[in-house]
Amino acid sequence: MKQFLRNCFSLSAQNRSTAEGRELTGNVRMKNLGFSPQLLRYFDDNSRRGRLEPADRQSEAENPVCGDWLVLTARVENQQLAQVRFQARGCVAAMACAAALAEALEGLPWEQADGLDLRAAILQRIERLPEASGHALELALTAGRKLFQN
């Protein structure tokens, strides 16, 4: 399983531009699919990818229809979400929603994060999500809610 995950992430990394100022391969085509430039930036952002070990909190969500999955891990220090990271396999929208969720949660006090309107926080960051990609938002919301369950 670990080797499978490494292969998935290395393939994903090959599809991204890493040089500052360069656009994502196929960016024009992605915009034509209804993805906002902000969503594409979150898809391309590696700053919160990965898994925290050890993690104080962890949640997982999977979409059995399309096979997308998401794992959130978090470190809690002084009742605050000090770090939030994600591992995901899925479409462009699933990766972008996961990255936006991790950014929205990181640094917030636990109680504020637990009460946060996750849907609004994600949509505020990615600006626009095509209707056909609603499953990606639901995946992130499910993992986000589970992070706060006992």
Each model region followed by its residue ranges:
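C-terminal binding/interaction regions
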Residues: 4-11, 21, 26-50, 59, ...
